[in-house]
Amino acid sequence: MNNIVLTLALVLGLTACGNNTAKNSSGTERQTAQNEKQNRVEVLYFHGKQRCATCMAIKKNAKEAVEAQFEEQLKNGSLVFKTIDISKEENEAIADKYEVTWSSLFLVRYQSGKESAENLTKYAFANARTAPDTFKQGLTEKINGLLD
């Protein structure tokens, strides 16, 4: 009985995180190509239609950290925070690019025409809800390292 309840809870939890796919759009590809011309760091928070408490904490705490610590960089465009709903057709290209199928957090650095991405999803799920200050501090340190 306990195994059935545990299994059901696990399945519902994973479903709530939004195991969705999206459709293709050339508009997103054009926008991505234009954005790659400027040196910058992007914080990309991906999500589906349904989000669990941890998924929502990732967005909330990531956005709070970025807005509190990087106001000047947000204004001058050297840092960008994007929320991307992977259940929308126009976001399929970017979701495919980073192989995202559920809630995820990436840091992407564009420097001299080259792109490097760091997947922080495991770190975010481990800390955003249960240790938000640790999450914010770690995210801030990672972003500072990429902005240098």
Describe each model-derived feature in a short phrase.
Residues 96-109:
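Structural micro-motif
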Residues 18-33:
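Short, low-complexity, disordered segments immediately C-terminal to signal peptides
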Residues 74-90:
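Thiol-based oxidoreductase modules, predominantly thioredoxin-like and allied folds used
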Residues 36-68:
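Local sequence-structure signature of Cys/Sec-based thiol-disulfide redox active-site neighborhoods
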Residues 2-8, 22:
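Sec-dependent signal peptide recognition
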Residues 107-148:
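Non-catalytic, surface beta->alpha helical segment in thiol-disulfide oxidoreductase systems
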Residues 13-16:
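C-terminal motif of bacterial Sec signal peptides marking the signal peptidase cleavage site
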